[in-house]
């Protein structure tokens, strides 16, 4: 979303019928912590029609409107490597954007969140559990969750303890974080991780197509 006109057009749709309920929930989260930031969910996603939830840890820098090239949106079209890798995997698997929706386990932007030590990070994960169930409750067609990274996977385990019936009803797929730290390695390593991501996303595509 490096072109501001395109960004503004997309932002104009944040209360479109398919994402209205989710983004109104985002508004309630923003009101709870007015000094902090939660990105709206991009209307490129299927919103209430989504069958696949893309679960990452927390908003990236490019979700912030004030950031250079920022969109103010949770979107796989954001101009950062983490979003680009997920977008590429979705395209490779033939998953339409309207078949999925993104969410951050801790939805507020926290600078450097991914590098926090466990004792500083885990309270955020505990808080995210009860927020995630509110999101899933707004996704009646949800079939699967794709988790990116160790920290949101830990959050999912906490979620499973609190909401076992909901967790059991969903097929779960996993991959490392697609951000710069998650893909820190040699060219050969990054290519292997990319291949693994494609394979896992293909499996997710098969499940949501059933």
Model-flagged regions — what are they?
Residues 1-163, 169-176:
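A polyanion-binding, active-site-adjacent surface
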Residues 91, 165-204:
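Short, flexible loop segments at boundaries between secondary-structure elements
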Residues 206-210:
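A charged, well-structured terminal subsegment
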